[in-house]
Amino acid sequence: MRVTKTTGGLSLPSTAERAAVLSAPVVETSFRTAFDSFAALHAVEVRAPEAPRKLGAHARIAFWNAERLKYEAASARLLVGLEADVLMLCELDLGMVRSGNRHTIRDLADTLGQGYVFGAEFVELGLGDLREQKAFAGQANSAGLHGGGFVSGAALERPALVRLETSGRWFDGAFHERRVGGRIAMLAEIRLADARVLLASVHYESHTGPADRLLQTEKMLDEIDAHSPGIPVLIGGDFNTNTHEREERAVPGTVEKSLAADPRRLQAPMAYEPMFDLLKRRGYGWNACNDMDAPTQRTRPDGTPKPPFGKIDWLFSRGLKCSTPATVAAVDSKGDAISDHEVLAVTIALA
């Protein structure tokens, strides 16, 4: 499912609309009805920069799972320091109390004096995960949107949202959150020396395993080729490549045993994640795009998540020359984490 309808402002789900979904029977038909009814899930919000900057033969691109983008000032300082031409972002809130009921990507774009593209991954029916439910008990979301997108001073052309799945697996609350929507890849084109290049900012499902990640990858690549056939591509995302099926992770000792057999498994998951073989067959590479020795996870100030950590965020390229890949610590001026994911950055040029 590819959404190409654009708007200057998404239609925000009202408190009453979200409450009505919460009170409906927890069955598939309720999910489908809710998914179809929330207009915010079926459009892409776009604001162009006032004076778009023309890119030359090279561009510095960064990807970050910003974990709600809730630390506004610290996140802006971190991202300004990257001097990136385009920021590819996921886990962005719009109207969530956990991030101050702000429009986080618009606020970031305002701070940077740039344009943005935003698409909604989920309509959140609650306050967030168990930590957030406890921290913000008794408060309310103003809109309840969570998604991904881009920020850039350059023109972001032909924006689109690809819905990687609409299973409704978050609808019944089995993962301690109730949500309407599904994982997404946000697409937009930039121009390097007037040549079109497609960027994809991606967030894969965190509660499945390698087999489902393969399916999401196939869907994503097919939609990329349908949207922008024959042009160079850079994909950045949180791919959650933890190398285990959800059922395996639930069995005590399974992860520890697998790491004892292969201590590099989480840092170099290629042999355990068939999505890498598919990407290779479809012409994508990753070694030149990534700092291959650096994990991309870190512990938040509340002590979660805990090691062992690995590389779950990746950049993949096709038809591009990648150089100077970096993994940048997602911390504030005191060294405290502002996300549980590090920032990835790379310089791209036409191959």
Where are the predicted features?
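Acidic/histidine-rich helix-loop elements
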Residues: S14-S23, E50-E72, L94-V97, L130, ...
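Structured beta-strand-rich core segments of catalytic domains in phosphoester-bond hydrolases
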Residues: V3, A24-R47, D93-D194
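Metal-dependent phosphoester-hydrolase catalytic domains
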Residues: M1-V46, L161, P210, I224-L234, ...
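Soluble or luminal CAZymes and related metallo-dependent hydrolases
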Residues: K70-Y71, G100, A143, R179-G182, ...
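Active-site-proximal loop/helix segment associated with metal-binding centers of metalloenzymes
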Residues: R179, V197-Y204, P263
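Eukaryote-specific, low-hydrophobicity, charge-rich regions
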Residues: T33-A66, A76-V86, G115
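Active-site beta-strand/loop signature of hydrolases that rely on acidic residues for catalysis
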Residues: R60-N65, S75-N101, V117-E121, V151, ...
